[in-house]
């Protein structure tokens, strides 16, 4: 199986009623080779950004090294007071995220609108 290169697209989105949110849209495989794409893109987000959506709907494969990168990013976000909401995970990865404790740092949502609305809670 050939690994699909990780792509991360950063964009701004207006979420009603909370306002501007930064969205990181992941695509491809997230593995140890994804460090620059995942952490590099996250580090480009200003500390003043307080709401981040993570979109995993384009992710086909995520291994333990990739999960470690996501956890590292979420810990860094937590330290700067950034809130993260997550959506688009395939059911298998939802179970894995829950088992490894990622849900301490984020809530998993079924879709983008639900994740967006969670910032107002």
Give residue spans per PLM region:
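Short, ordered loop/turn segments at secondary-structure junctions
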Residues: 89, 112-113
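Amphipathic alpha-helical interaction surfaces in cytosolic regulatory modules
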Residues: 32-106
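STAS-typified acidic loop motif
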Residues: 2-43
